[in-house]
């Protein structure tokens, strides 16, 4: 399947829209915080591409993206409210509780079986798990034996886990990878800040081949 790692934000009228940043400055022809606009007000603006060129596209709602992608895309939800500087503990907890309400039976996301949650710690994963969330997988960082032991000791079965092993396969951590694979866990690297940034096309191709030869199960790329 195709994997999309997506970010979203709340509008002023509590509509969840796809938006990586908490502001619309970088990715649209508008300015300001997402939370300062209603969904309808945001439709005045158009998205720009990675080169800053204006496109005909508007900011989409999360539920429209979920409906479009069901049965063909696995969505990896990144909760930016967890690790963004300046976000209060109250807002962080509220965002976790919002996810839980949406994933529970009757919630807006409960009908979709193609959702994965990026979590930053075993404590965050356990918060979901202890609130009865069983209909998603968790993308968690396991880039050390300490990380592996923490999840091994948790009540979360390995079948709910995909392991993010950071920016590249590290030969010194082969034992960790072997333990993960023995549990049926897939490993994922992210090259968005490394190979993706190589400007020369030939050198970038070489960098990509190097990543493929390292044999992670999944490679995250922009």
Q: Predicted regions: what is each one?
A:
Residues 2, 65, 176:
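Aromatic/hydrophobic pocket-lining residues that form π-stacking "cages" and hydrophobic walls in ligand
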Residues 1, 34, 107, 153-155, ...:
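Structural motif
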Residues 3-5, 18, 76-78, 162-164, ...:
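Conserved beta-strand positions in the central sheet of alpha/beta enzyme cores
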Residues 1, 71, 111, 157-159, ...:
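Short loop/turn motifs at secondary-structure junctions
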Residues 9, 13, 21-22, 45, ...:
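Active-site beta-loop-alpha junctions enriched in small/polar residues
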Residues 15, 20-126, 130-131, 135, ...:
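Metal-dependent phosphodiesterase/phospholipase catalytic core, i.e.
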């Amino acid at each position: 399947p195709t994997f999309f790692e997506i970010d979203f934000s709340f509008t002023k009228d509590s509509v969840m829209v796809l938006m990586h940043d908490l502001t619309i400055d970088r990715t649209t022809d508008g300015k300001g915080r997402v939370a300062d606009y209603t969904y309808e007000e945001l439709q005045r603006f158009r998205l720009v591409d990675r080169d800053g060129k204006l496109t005909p596209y508007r900011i989409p709602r999360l539920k429209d993206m979920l409906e479009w992608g069901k049965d063909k895309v696995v969505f990896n939800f990144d909760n930016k409210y967890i690790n963004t500087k300046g976000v209060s503990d109250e807002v962080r907890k509220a965002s976790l509780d919002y996810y839980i309400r949406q994933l529970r039976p009757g919630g807006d996301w409960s009908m979709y079986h193609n959702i994965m949650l990026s979590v930053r710690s075993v404590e965050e994963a356990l918060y979901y798990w202890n609130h009865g969330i069983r209909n998603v997988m968790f993308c968690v960082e396991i880039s050390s034996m300490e990380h592996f032991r923490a999840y091994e000791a948790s009540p979360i079965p390995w079948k709910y886990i995909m392991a993010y092993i950071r920016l590249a396969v590290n030969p010194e951590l082969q034992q960790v990878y072997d333990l993960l694979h023995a549990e049926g866990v897939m490993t994922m690297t992210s090259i968005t800040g490394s190979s993706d940034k190589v400007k020369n096309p030939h050198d970038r191709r070489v960098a990509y081949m190097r990543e493929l030869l390292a044999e992670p199960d999944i490679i995250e790329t922009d």
